[in-house]
Structure formats: C-alpha cells, structure tokens
C-alpha cells in the first residue's frame, strides 16, 4: 500500500456502485491517493434508466470510499462530452487539492447492442461522444496542467478487448475503443517529452451493473439465460472466469505508479488470456 501516496487522481464515470470507476477510485485511495470522482449525475436522466448514476449515487460512492479508506474523496458532476464541464472539473480539482497527477478516462457507454444496419445515427454519435470525445477533452485540458506543474503525469484510458478484436453488433462501441487506442498512442508520442505517460487498459467482460445489462441483452439475442451467457464467456477465457472490477483497478494502479514509469503508449490486456495481442 502507499504507491500513490499524496498523488491526486481524477476518475471519470465513477458514480455507480459496483462500477469500474468506483473500483478504480477505491484502489487509488487505498494506495494513498486523494481522489476526485465524476459522473454525469441527474442531467444523465435522459439516458436509459439504471445506466447513469444520479448525483446522490455519486456522493454515495464518495462516502463509501471515504468510509473504508479514510482518504480525501471529492465528487463532481461532469458531462465528459462538454468541454466547459471538463475544464471546470480540472480547474476545481487543482484549486481544491493543489495539484493533479493522474487522469483515468473511465466514463463510457456500451449498452446498445445492434447490427450495423439497425444502428441509428444518434446511437452511433452518443457512443463516440462519450467514449472518444470525452477522453480527448480530458487529455487536451489535463496535459497543460501536467506540463505547468513540471513533474509529469499519467493518463489512463479504459478501453476494451473490443479495441483489438471485432465485436459483432457493437460497431459503434468497438470503433470508439479502437479510436481510443489511437488517441492513447498519439498522445503518448506527443507528451512523452514532458514526462507524461499515456496508456490504455483493455478489459474483457466485467460483470458490473452495466455488464449485467449487457448479459441480459446478449441472452435475448443468443436465446439463453444470463447464466448461459456467462458460461459461454468463460469458455473462451483460458483462466476460466470473467473479469473482476479489481483486475482492472489493479492494472490502473500499476500504470499510475512509479513501477510503470517507463511504460507509455501501451494497451494492456486484462482479459484472463481471452485477448492476446
């Protein structure tokens, strides 16, 4: 413990209990970081119910992390598609906590499962806006803060194994995550001379709240119940189980720590061997 002591980490899309963002924020706090968690909050109610955390749930996540880690945890509302929101959250983080060391671009949408011929333009656009525009905006506006501080920084993008292999009925999601790998590599090349590392983590299926929705939808498509979907997923994984939130969170801790100081531009598979390139 203590690998991130006194660091300040900002994690987007962390306003849901049992979500990846909550798990990442908790692990960072356990390692000594001061943490800022964001989510879209109540403005996200125009999106499908149950997939977007409310303002109250975001604060509940923050309280939960404080309770088990005794760390500083701030919660802020942010629509990652909004440049003004992104700038405001970064500015508030530096004002409140005095610095910014780590950004984890975790906010993402993956609930729409349709063949290309049935996808609407609105469905395509919202996935690309959240999954790719959001990380672009946080990279764009966090990098100058890192440069001004003078001691580098870490940007970690939560991608997916769908960033490396075809994902039928997820053309929008897969395209956004392939694009995120491109952004990761390009930003790493541009920002490395400032001591800024930029990496991606590529999990396979993780049964979060969103993952449960995906399993239900997959079951409808495949004509099986959720347990059948999980058995099918496990059959493709050499280590024999689906991913856990802690698997992804631990990878993020590593990439944000001094142990990964010489690693940048990489996309780290966290998939139990399901993805091997």
Which residues are covered by each model-predicted region?
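Active-site helix of classical SDR
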Residues: 139, 176, 184
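Substrate-binding pocket helix/loop in short-chain dehydrogenase/reductase
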Residues: 114-116, 123-128, 233-234
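Canonical Rossmann dinucleotide-binding motif of NAD(H)/NADP(H)-dependent dehydrogenases/reductases
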Residues: 2-37
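Short, small/polar-rich loop/turn modules that mediate ligand/substrate recognition or access, typified
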Residues: 192, 197, 263-265
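The beta1-alpha1 cofactor-binding region of Rossmann-like NAD(H)/NADP(H)-dependent oxidoreductases
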Residues: 55-59, 77-89, 121, 247
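Short C-terminal tail/terminal secondary-structure segment
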Residues: 110-113, 165, 240-241, 252-254, ...
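Residue(s) in the substrate-gating loop at a strand-loop-helix junction
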Residues: 160
């Amino acid at each position: 413990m203590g690998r991130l002591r006194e660091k300040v980490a900002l994690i987007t899309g962390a306003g849901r209990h049992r979500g990846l963002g909550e798990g990442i924020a908790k692990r960072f706090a356990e390692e000594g970081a001061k943490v800022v968690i964001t989510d879209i909050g109540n403005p996200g109610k125009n999106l499908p119910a149950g997939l977007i955390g409310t303002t109250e749930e975001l604060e509940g996540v923050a309280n939960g992390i404080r309770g088990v880690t005794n760390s500083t945890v701030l919660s802020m509302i942010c629509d990652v598609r909004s440049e003004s929101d992104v700038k405001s959250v970064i500015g508030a983080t530096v004002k409140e906590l005095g610095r910014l060391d780590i950004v984890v671009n975790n906010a993402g949408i993956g609930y729409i499962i349709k063949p290309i011929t049935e996808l609407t333009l609105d469905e395509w656009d919202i996935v690309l806006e959240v999954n790719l525009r959001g990380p672009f905006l946080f990279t764009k506006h966090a990098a100058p803060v890192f440069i001004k501080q003078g001691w580098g920084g870490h940007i970690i993008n939560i991608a997916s194994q769908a960033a490396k292999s075809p994902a039928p009925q997820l053309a929008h999601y897969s395209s956004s995550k392939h694009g995120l790998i491109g952004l990761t590599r390009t930003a790493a090349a541009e920002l490395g001379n400032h001591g800024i590392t930029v990496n991606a983590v590529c999990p396979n299926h993780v049964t979060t709240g969103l993952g449960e929705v995906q399993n239900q939808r997959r079951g409808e498509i495949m004509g099986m119940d959720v347990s059948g979907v999980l058995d099918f997923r496990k059959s493709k994984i050499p280590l024999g189980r689906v991913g856990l939130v802690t698997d992804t969170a631990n990878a993020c801790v590593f990439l944000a720590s001094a142990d990964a100081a010489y690693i940048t531009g990489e996309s780290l598979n966290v998939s139990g061997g399901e993805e091997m390139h």
